[in-house]
Amino acid sequence: MAGEIQDPFSLSFQGNSIHSGSISFGRFEKEGLSWEKRSSFSHNRYLEEVDKCSKPGSVTEMKAHFEAHFKKKGIRFPASLESQTWGVHQTSNEPDDEAVHATESFEDYRSDGSFSEDTSQSNSVCNYSHEQEKCGQGKSQCEFDEESDHCVSYDEILVNSDEVIELDEEEGGGDHGRVADLVECENLGPPEMPQEIVIQDSALVEEAGSKLDEHASKKPSNSMETPSSSVNVKPIIPNDVRVTKASTKGHDVTPKAASRRTKGSSLSSNSKTNVDAKSQKELRPKKTIESQPKSSNKTETRPPIATNRCKTSTTSSKLEMSTGSTSFRFKCSERAEKRKEFYMKLEEKIHAKKTETNQVQAKTQQKAEAEIKQFRKSLNFKATPMPSFYNIGTRPVSHNKTEPSKVAQSRSRPATSASITNRAVTRVSYKHGFEEAEMVKVMVSNRKQSAAKDSDLQKGNLMAVEMKQQIGARRSRN
């Protein structure tokens, strides 16, 4: 029994020692915690691609991979940022057949392959189109919208303008050249035939340049106006025009008419370039040949083509701006008017309260005055001669030497005056009534107060005289 009990205990101890450190909820430190299994959120498959691209050197690997892929497909991979941006800008309402074919093949590759490309790169590659055309005399025409060097923006110049560049080639060899401009367009001619672009009529180049400068200076980038006269301008081909050799393909491919009508259209211009066959012998060993500077270029210009700019779009935008501004101002003015009305109402209320209080005060004053008048009329007071004791004046006290007998006499006089006033009050009360007697009592009390004040003054004067006498006696003794 003891052996049977010890065996499962030892097995459980060994199982715990395998995991070594345990975490709560039945998980262990060495166990792989994949959040995809336990999370309620759906797995985002793009995170894996982000992890791949976040590693250092992944961008260069993808670039090399896609370059090899596009070389196999026969499509030229965009080599510069300018070509990428040109491919993004050159969007059309009617895509070409081979561009659609390129997009389909690229999407098939994305579904099969392990890498995914940015949208900007894929758009720039897919928007690139080329098509084969052959003429009887070996001339190829390429219609495309070209961005001129005079920086005329897409908003300035309007739609319905097509641009034609005719490249005159001589058929002869097996190799083909490639012209790399801001607009990418492949001219695949006979083999080992580098081409030099020769442009005619140098006198007309300056006229076209001056016209373009004046046109760009007169029209700002944001404003759109309809010109009265039609304009036909052929751009000067920039210095960046290069003729390169194609390395792999032996078939002839000429650029198709890629005339596109964009909403913010580019400048309409027609230019013809003639390619001389004499320069072939001189330029065979070179792979890339740069064109001569603008001063040596000769351009053939034609009378200007009509460029239509719509005034309705500008007027509509101006109307929208004006309506927006007027609505905003109208709201502000409404708020200001409401505030003014509110303050006016407050002022009117305050003025009304003030007028009410003033009216109440005036009414109370009028009532008080009327009551006083009525009270005076009810008294029936008549002016009577003053009693004789008011005419009796007190004798002036000598401030010099006075005797105590005189002081005693002056003290006894107010008592006699008080008795006289009492007698006068009694007489008045009998004659004129009770109200007049009260008035006389008030007058008598006032007289008593004045007499008491006079007596106090007399006492003070007497005390001062006594003090002076004492001081004089002391001095005489000394």
Swiss-Prot record:
Coiled-coil stretches noted in the UniProt entry, renumbered to this chain:
none
List the subcellular locations.
Answer: Cytoplasm, Cytoskeleton
Name the principal localization, coarsely classed. Answer: cytoplasm
Compositionally biased tracts (Polar residues): 219-232, 264-277, 309-326, 407-420
Q: Where is this region: Disordered?
A: 201-326, 385-420
| Keyword Nucleotide-binding part of the UniProt annotation | no
Q: Which InterPro entries match?
A: TPX2_C, WDL7
Q: In which tissues is it expressed?
A: Expressed in seedlings.
> Basic and acidic residues compositional bias: what residue ranges?
208-217, 278-289
Q: Which UniProt keywords apply?
A: Cytoplasm, Cytoskeleton, Microtubule
One GO term under biological process is:
response to abscisic acid
- One Gene Ontology cellular component: cortical microtubule
The cross-references to Pfam families, in alphabetical order and at most eight, read: TPX2
Q: Which family is annotated?
A: Belongs to the TPX2 family.
The role this protein plays is:
Microtubule-associated protein (MAP) that regulates the orientation of interphase cortical microtubules.
Q: What is this protein called?
A: Protein WVD2-like 7
Gene encoding the protein: WDL7
